């Protein structure tokens, strides 16, 4: 939960600097509404499925945070995670291709 708190701290701090704190707080609250188990599964599945696109999105977000003069520690960590997911997917694809060639 400490990592989740760090995401909220970084996000709300940036939103405050950008003049859209109220909007972002509502967006975060809306994400937490509903079925928490489904949210966790959606985050896991969606991160793996869309890692390439999300890596680019968080890179753009990091640049924006830098432009605001705000820390981007969590955003940088998210970028590393999406890169890791891409590497894992590429390794799995390579293994599947290799296995298919042996069959």
Question: What residue ranges belong to the model's regions?
Answer:
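Short, basic/aromatic-enriched C-terminal tail that caps enzymatic domains
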Residues: 91-103
């Amino acid at each position: 939960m400490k990592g989740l708190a760090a995401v909220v701290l970084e996000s709300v701090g940036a939103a405050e600097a950008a003049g859209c704190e109220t909007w972002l707080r509502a967006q975060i609250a809306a994400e937490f509404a509903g079925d928490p188990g489904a949210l966790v599964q959606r985050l896991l599945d969606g991160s793996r499925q869309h890692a390439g696109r999300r890596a680019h999105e968080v890179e753009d977000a990091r640049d924006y945070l830098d432009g605001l003069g705000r820390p981007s520690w969590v955003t940088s960590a998210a970028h590393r995670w999406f890169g890791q997911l891409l590497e894992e997917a590429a390794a799995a694809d390579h293994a599947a291709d290799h296995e298919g060639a042996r069959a």
